[in-house]
Amino acid sequence: MSCADECLEFLSTSATSEIEERHGAQESCHRQADAVKRRVTECRAVGLRSVQPRRLKAPCNIVVILASVCLLAASACGGPSRSKEAPGLVERSRVSMGTEVHISAWTTDEAAAVTAFDKAFNEFDRLDALMSTWKAGSDITRLNDAAGTVAVPVSVEVREVLHASQEVSEWTGGKFDVTFAALSGLWKFDHDIDGHVPDRAEIAPRLPLIDYRALTIDDRAGTASLARAGMKVNLGGIGKGYAIDRAVSILRDAGLSDFLVQSGGDLFAAGKRGDRPWRVGIQDPRGAPDTLFAALEITDAAFSTSGDYERFFIRDGHRYHHILDPDTGEPAARSRSVSILAKSTTVTDGLSTGVFILGGDEGMALIEKLPDVEGVIVTAENRVLVSSGLKGRLVQLKAPSE
């Protein structure tokens, strides 16, 4: 296989749940090409061909650039072109819900796929308008503003996500709790990151306001309410998964059967990429950027990863990250990374967060108890725990870095 062919094979057969928010879009094409060459070298070094389930961790917008680099390389080398009748990979990306949404489909009809993609992207935007805490007038903004007073009308979609969040809360003993948003403003890990570590005097008054059981959903009336003033809901830990599930339904209704939808650390893979399953990778939590420690082939399944290495800051040698334990109001300290495989991305999105907070042994016990759920946990001590259903399926490429 030529270098150009290997590059094309790598890009077209791989997917990772670790593509996060758009950044570095101005990186030069030369650096992109170097990254591809480096990736091919890594594959050869560990005895893997590029068809193995690994890929570069990069913003989704860069995936398109990398693909262009490789296509140009193939042309320069005189590689064969794909006929219009032959199936191939169609890919598009758009920013929604604060991150890059990437959709790929293996199909013979590019025009029909792109039309379906647009409908799926529009659904992300529609749900964002309902669930965002940043948009005035959204269902969640109105729910938060009315906390401790009256129930407010909310859409059926928001009620479905709230019901799903409460189910995951029950499974995890409250470790996953969308009312953790009562802590908002104390910790800053997004564009407003400032390295401030709130003290107990700041955190303690907020903790009684975190209680998923004080969230009431009335499907008959079409309303939701929060019992106490100061309570807040944030669906950032489950909303993207729900949006992916909705997008999957749209793509299937459009007649697509082989596709992948990805938003941040969450994805759903339907069917296959040609004659192979889709391949996903798990990032090494303490490794260099773009380094994976494990990989997995999946089909017709959801996959989500939560980790302490994306949104964080270091102060006085201690890592502070965005996954907060609702019992302490501080960053959870028992895990480095949790990946969950299940049938629904709504479930994998919320459960990966809840299991991350539970930690290794308790989290794995929950995974083993839940039907149709598998998982991989990298504990705070850097132990790798693999659920029974993934043993023999998960390819561990290296030990996670210390």
Residue locations for each model-derived region?
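Mature catalytic core of soluble alpha/beta enzymes
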Residues: C3, F10, C29, K37, ...
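Intrinsic disorder/low-complexity segments
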Residues: M1-I65
